[in-house]
Amino acid sequence: MEWRGILCSLLFIVSVGESSSRFGIMWHPNLGVDSGQYLTWPILSASVFVVIAILLPMYLIFEHLASYNQPEEQKFLIGLILMVPVYAVESFLSLVNSEAAFNCEVIRDCYEAFALYCFERYLIACLDGEERTIEFMEQQTVITQSTPLLEGTCSYGVVEHPFPMNCFVKDWSLGPQFYHAVKIGIVQYMILKMICALLAMILEAFGVYGEGKFAWNYGYPYLAVVLNFSQTWALYCLVQFYNVIKDKLAPIKPLAKFLTFKSIVFLTWWQGIIVAFLFSMGLVKGSLAKELKTRIQDYIICIEMGIAAVVHLYVFPAAPYKRGERCVRNVAVMSDYASIDVPPDPEEVKDSERTTRTRYGRHDDREKRLNFPQSVRDVVLGSGEIIVDDMRFTVSHVVEPVERGIAKINRTFHQISENVKRFEQQKKTTKDDSYVIPLNQWAKEFSDVHENLYDGGSVSDSGLGSTNRHHQSRVSGLWTRMRR
C-alpha cells in the first residue's frame, strides 16, 4: 500500500506538470523570454526527479523512525539519508532562481561536511561505540611475509601513509592515536566549512567574494584553498578509517554504503569541472546548452539525486532494525544483516553473536521503546549533543598546540629583543677606542722580522732585544709626530 501511494503521487505530479505545460501556464525561470519555450521540459524533468528524491528518502526516514531500535546507529543514518533531499531541493531552487544560487550552494556545501561526519559516526555506532572501536583497533596487527609469526601476533598495527603524505605525517598507531586523528580530521572540515560559509556570505554582501575569480583582491581563492585542503584531509581520514574497519563491518556491506556516499560527494564536484571544460572547449553547442550554461550543474544534480534516492532504499534499509523488535534493544544489528542475504560465516556469526537470548517482545518491552515523537526528539537532540561534544573535543585539541606554538614564537621574539637590548647596552658602556693606532700602521714594523724568518735567518735574544729597542724608538717617534 505504501509503494502504491508513492507511485500514485508521482503519476499525479507528472500529469499535472504535463497538463500545465500543454496549456502554456508552465512557469519559466528568469533566463529571458526567448528561452522560456526551451525550458519547459528541463524544469519538468528535473521536478520529477526532485519529487522522487524527496518522497523516497522521507519514506525511508519514516521507516527508520518507526523501527527506532538502535538509536546510536539510526540517528546518524537518518542524517546521512537526508543528504539526498537537501541536495535535490537546493539544486532545483538554484536552477529556477539564479539569485538564490549562491545561498543554495553554501547550504549544500555545509550539509556535505555534516553528512561526512554522520557517515563516520554511523560506522562507529555499528562497532558499538568509541570504546569498542578503540579496543578493536588495538587488537589489529600488520603482518607481512617478513614478519615473524610470534612477533606479528602481539604487535600493534600501524597505519602507513602513502607518498607524499609519509614525508609530512608520521605513521599512526591503531588505537587512541589513530581514532582521535580521524575524528579531528573529519570534524575540522565541518567546523571550517561553517566558518568559511559565513565568511563567504559576508564577503558576498560587500561585493568582494568574487566566486570563480582567482584574483588577490577577492576572497574566493583564499577560502577555496583552505576548504580544498580541509576537504582532502577529511576524506583521507575517512578512507583510512574505512580500510581499518571494513572487514569487521562486512555483514552490513560497508563498501556499498561507502561508494554511495562518496559518489555523491565527488560527482557533484568533478562534473562541475567537466561541464566547465566542455563549454570552454566549445564541445557543447546549441541554444539550449548556452542558456543552461550556468545551471546545467544544478540540473544534473537533480537527476542524480533521484537515482540516489532509489539506491538508498537498498543501501540503507530499515529491515535489519525491524528485526530488532523481537530482541533486546541494546544489541547491535550485525547478525540481523548477516541473516538477511549474506552467506553465514562461522567466525562472523561467532563474533556478532548476541550475549543475550532473543525473545519475543512483551508489553513492558514495547513501553521501553521510543514512540515516533520521542524518536524524532532523540535524532535532533541526541545527535546534537554528540556533535557539540566532538566539536569541543576537536577545538580543544587544535587550539592547544596552536597556543603552544604561539607561546614559543613569543618566547623567541622576546629572546631576540632581549639580546638586541643587551647588545645596545654593551655598545653604550664600551669606551671610545678611536685613538688606538690601526693595525696597518704596525704592519711595516713587523715586516722586517717576517722577512728575516722567511729568508732563513735566525733571531737571537740579543738581536731580538735590539730590534725591539729599535721598534720602540720608532714607535715613540711616530707617537710624538701624531701628538703634534
UniProtKB/Swiss-Prot annotation:
Residues 1-19 form the signal peptide. Its main location: membrane. Pfam families: Solute_trans_a (PF03619). Residues 347-364 have a biased composition (Basic and acidic residues). Residues 406-428 form a coiled coil. It is found in: Membrane. It comes from the Eukaryota. Belongs to the TMEM184 family. This is Protein LAZ1 homolog 1. It comes from Arabidopsis thaliana.
